[in-house]
Amino acid sequence: MNNMSLHQTGLKQAATITVCFLLLKTAIAADLNQTKETFSSKTTKTYSYSYLKYLPDGYDGKKEFPLLLFLHGAGERGDNLELVTKHGPPKLIKNGKKFPFIVISPQCPKGVWWKADGLDALLDGFISKHAVDRSRIYCTGLSMGGFGTWALGGLNPKRFAALAPICGGGNSIDARHIGKKPVWVFHGAKDKVIPLTESERMVNALKRRGGKPKFTIYPEAGHDSWTEAYNNPKLYEWFLSQKIK
């Protein structure tokens, strides 16, 4: 990764989710042969993500900085972090762009999709080791990463100050969980890979919950609505204006 920004480094972290299942079986005694039993089982899911880490100028591990999580699309899956620099903030950083916040850009393994619980655990681990302003954590993603942004925001809406899914979609239940959280949605009107209706459905679900999402539709854009979105400095200004109170 010699052609990568010196501030953007590749790291690997295992995100482990421990799920406890407890089954309590209570017997209604009919005779002495019926007893009360308790069964407990503990299972562990492990997700392993390589990711790019960008630390802004002035980061010294003491002063807390905002954090942006970027989720790439399906075409950048694999085990080569250079793929992650193809689009979005990692591409801009690679080309010399400086941001006033931390950026982490994980890579999804081949053949799978973003898992919200794995990403949530990744953030837990990262935040525990870095000076992060927990009131200013943001998530954005494109295509498959747009779906991941909706899913992660729905899983843990209290974590994020704002979300920006691009040409994505998802489960309207996630939109209901996100509710009034600041969200800026982007989509191309001529997208034949993920139709505009996917974002429209999620935006409408937010509105039904009292949300006031921003919704930018690029009338001439196909699936690539992310280049224009991520090249827009107003997106990052908007992110930084959002804070959990």
Where do the model's predicted regions map?
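Active-site machinery of serine-nucleophile hydrolases
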Residues: 67, 74-118
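C-terminal catalytic histidine-bearing segment of alpha/beta-hydrolase fold enzymes
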Residues: 186, 192-245
